[in-house]
């Protein structure tokens, strides 16, 4: 089990670091009193591997409880319980700027100057910083920079492509564009199988409709261009730290063209070693047209 204690200066990025750890599959607990860490660690270690990555956020907001941290760490060490400490730091100038931008007061100086609170906090955290296994200075970091750094230290070293969940979603414009779409493509310019009597009753999941749609010159050109676009976009989304991408492909009713093309894009993404899923939101809607609604 990997057991990470996250601490550091207020405003240095502990919240963002914790979100990154959650994205990496860590079970995160915020501001657990240090005296409870021993019991929590024992429970985690007895969990039959159900919890194998844990992160505890400990900061100065714990007040007097924070003073118990060193006693707890010594206890864990004596009992050969492996843990690591991550310390988030930043320059005084950057911390002051962040507090001013957020219009928050410093927890150690709620009615006074932010700088006074920072000075006090540095003094109180000096010993825990000296014990830290990893110190990350976020002074020059944007959120994505910190995310990349967290992945570097705490990721599972799986291919970055596998860390972006891609959903290819077919839909019908008559039923509305999916509200959670990241990318939306309109394929209503492609010849419609709906007007072919022998194909009308089938969907884009059926071979006859799929073959008809994919052999169209417009489809061939569109799919190639879309694949080129995704080969450019996906690595950049991963670099940015995006965790989920929803690609919505729509036709009129969401039954023929969008389904066939969504399936084709889904297959190409998986061949390209990406983690993709396929959903057809409206493929059965036209079957229920004319039915009375409750």
Curated annotation (Swiss-Prot):
It comes from the Bacteria. Keywords: ATP-binding, GTP-binding, Nucleotide-binding. GTP binds at residues 59-62. The keyword ATP-binding applies. It holds the Pfam family RapZ-like_N. SUPFAM superfamilies: P-loop containing nucleoside triphosphate hydrolases (SSF52540). One of its GO terms (molecular function) is ATP binding. ATP binds at residues 8-15. InterPro entries: P-loop_NTPase (IPR027417), RapZ-like (IPR005337), RapZ-like_N (IPR053930), RapZ_C (IPR053931). Belongs to the RapZ-like family. HAMAP family: RapZ_like (MF_00636). Displays ATPase and GTPase activities. This is Nucleotide-binding protein CLL_A3342. The lineage of its organism: Bacteria, Bacillati, Bacillota, Clostridia, Eubacteriales.
